[in-house]
């Protein structure tokens, strides 16, 4: 009996997908809403020792008691208010101005449900380090950065190779900046509770700050000792605030520039440590540094080559962003600094840089610089554009495609015959529930997390394609709503079916067999066949006839697929980010190649 139990444990262990640290989306295929496919390993070449940093804002907590205001909505009602600071349409009470609504809502940076989403999305993108914006005074947003560190460490324990962290302090060696660096050193770095997250450069934790603020102090041995301790702990790269002049000292790093960007921190071999890539810039040709609502501001649709695009759809294509990436490829630095991920908010001033009723850093969809997906508008286009360019910059070790010869599976609940089948990993621990306050009166509740998908397998023979899926715990009843759906793209085209998926399994609640349905176009499905399936504990296996998928039994084929459980909104691909579990996340798919 003991030997039998040991054998069963070994068999189960062989089939259980291990949770190893990896950026599992780095090499998966995806196609964005514009039909742009992510490049493959063959297209981008071998992996290189390059790094990607992303500007990240942790200040979405301290002022979150304020109500949300979206200025473009007010201006749509009263266009004359655009340049009138005192127009009565503008609220006199305290509000916070958002240029649009994030996909995850008007969240606070302490919302661990959102932080976990960020961890997975940025790991899948191949981002190496997040730079926290602490450029204003001595603010470090402790509550937020500690929530992020805790969540990222939890994600790492679940197998997510999250980005590491660094801070960018003020653009000059101010007393407030010294206060900030002492605070984060004592609270975060010296205790080293989250040392695994510290991004190092030249062997030390990196900080974008000016070391001069930590100079020795004549006559004050105690402060001198503190300054030396902190000064010796970090590698310093001071931030250059100006967009058009490049580095003004050998150790300068940039954060945002207009095209053509400069290389920063020249190296002995003639290369550069760093260069910037921005989504847009609060700059105009006639005024230089400008508010984002100044006419002529360099928005998302602007390029130095062609000026301001008049195409209404250009804002969705990231023209400015792509031009900046092309320049970064020319510079070929060690690290690209991207601005940015999730700023979202901006102040409003009577006059700033000659602009009345000025919104300095953001304004509307066109005049904003966030990559994080938004509700409506350009959706997640900029996220996948970033992923594509990170792949081109860093290269790829290999394409995550599984190739296999014929391998017959018996659908009998005995999973031993899956040993040796093509295996795919999925991140565990991402079905946590959400119950968090947002900005103002917003409160977000999401209890859709249910079956936590942790792995998948595929096999085929002349008659069937076999799918296996594994969850972290026992799979719930097939009678549950939106239960364990399998999406299949049989032609690898995004223009056919629904969002490229030609077939869906389990859209209709299964009975003795599962129902396979086909889409000719959009979220309109018709029955294509039945599929035998078996669930046992945390595992399920399915056999789908090749004829039902219109896949010739003699020809090799490639398919993309994904598993999704408990989606809440049919026909909305953005629900893959928001509800239940999707493996892999968002628009990413697994790729299977039959020999």
What are these regions (language model features)?
Residues 22-410, 414-415, 422, 500, ...:
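Glycan-processing catalytic domains of CAZymes
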Residues 54, 122, 343, 467, ...:
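Residue-level detector of buried hydrophobic side-chain packing
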Residues 401-412, 419, 487-514, 547-595:
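Acidic/polar low-complexity flexible segments
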Residues 413, 464-473, 539-546:
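Short, well-ordered beta-strand segments enriched in hydrophobic/aromatic residues
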């Amino acid at each position: 009996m003991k030997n039998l139990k040991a054998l069963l444990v070994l068999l189960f262990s062989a089939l259980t997908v291990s949770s190893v640290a990896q950026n599992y989306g780095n090499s998966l295929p995806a196609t964005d809403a514009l039909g742009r496919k992510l490049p493959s390993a063959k297209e981008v070449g071998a992996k290189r020792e390059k790094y990607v940093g992303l500007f990240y804002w942790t200040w979405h907590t301290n002022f979150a008691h304020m109500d949300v205001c979206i200025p473009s909505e007010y201006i749509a009602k009263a266009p004359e208010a655009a340049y009138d600071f005192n127009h009565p349409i503008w609220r006199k009470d305290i509000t916070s101005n958002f240029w649009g609504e994030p996909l995850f809502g008007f969240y606070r940076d302490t919302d661990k449900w959102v932080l976990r989403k960020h961890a997975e999305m940025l790991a899948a993108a191949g981002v190496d380090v997040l730079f926290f914006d602490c450029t204003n005074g001595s603010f470090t947003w402790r509550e937020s950065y500690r929530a992020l560190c805790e969540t990222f460490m939890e994600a790492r324990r679940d197998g997510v190779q999250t980005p590491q962290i660094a801070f960018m302090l003020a653009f000059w060696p101010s007393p407030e900046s010294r206060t900030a660096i002492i605070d984060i050193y004592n609270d975060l770095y010296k205790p080293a509770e989250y040392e695994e997250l510290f991004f190092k450069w030249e062997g030390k934790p990196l900080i974008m700050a000016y070391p001069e603020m930590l100079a020795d102090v004549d006559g004050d041995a105690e402060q001198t000792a503190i300054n030396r301790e902190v000064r010796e702990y970090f590698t310093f790269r001071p931030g250059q605030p100006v967009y058009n002049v490049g580095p003004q000292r050998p150790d300068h790093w940039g954060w945002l520039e207009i095209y053509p960007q400069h290389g920063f921190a020249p190296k002995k071999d003639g290369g550069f440590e760093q260069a910037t890539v921005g989504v847009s810039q609060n700059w105009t040709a006639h005024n230089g540094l400008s508010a984002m609502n100044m006419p002529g501001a360099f928005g998302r649709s602007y390029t130095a080559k062609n000026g301001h695009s008049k195409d209404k759809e250009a804002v969705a294509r990231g023209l400015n962003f792509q031009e900046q990436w092309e320049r970064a490829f020319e510079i070929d630095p060690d690290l690209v600094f991207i601005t940015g991920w999730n700023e979202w908010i901006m102040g409003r001033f009577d006059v700033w840089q000659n602009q009345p009723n000025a919104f300095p850093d953001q304004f509307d969809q066109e005049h904003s610089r966030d990559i994080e997906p938004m509700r409506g508008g350009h959706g997640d286009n900029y996220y996948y554009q970033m992923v594509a360019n990170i792949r081109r910059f860093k290269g790829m070790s290999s394409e995550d495609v599984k190739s296999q010869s014929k391998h017959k599976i018996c659908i009998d609940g005995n999973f031993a015959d899956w040993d040796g089948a093509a295996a795919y990993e999925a991140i565990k621990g991402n079905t946590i529930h959400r119950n968090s306050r947002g900005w103002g009166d917003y409160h977000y509740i999401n209890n859709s997390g249910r079956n936590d998908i942790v792995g998948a397998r595929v096999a085929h023979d002349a008659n069937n394609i076999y799918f296996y899926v594994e969850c972290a715990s026992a799979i719930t009843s097939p009678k549950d709503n939106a239960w364990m759906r399998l999406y299949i793209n049989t032609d690898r085209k995004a223009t056919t079916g629904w969002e490229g998926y030609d077939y869906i399994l389990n859209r209709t609640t299964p009975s003795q067999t599962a129902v396979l349905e086909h889409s000719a176009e959009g979220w309109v499905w018709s029955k294509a066949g039945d599929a035998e399936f078996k669930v046992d504990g945390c595992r399920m296996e399915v056999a789908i006839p090749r004829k039902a998928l219109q896949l010739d039994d003699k020809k090799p084929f490639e398919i993309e697929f994904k598993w999704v459980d408990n989606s809440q909104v049919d026909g909305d691909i953005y629900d893959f980010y928001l509800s239940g579990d999707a493996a892999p996340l968002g628009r990413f798919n697994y790729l299977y190649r039959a020999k």
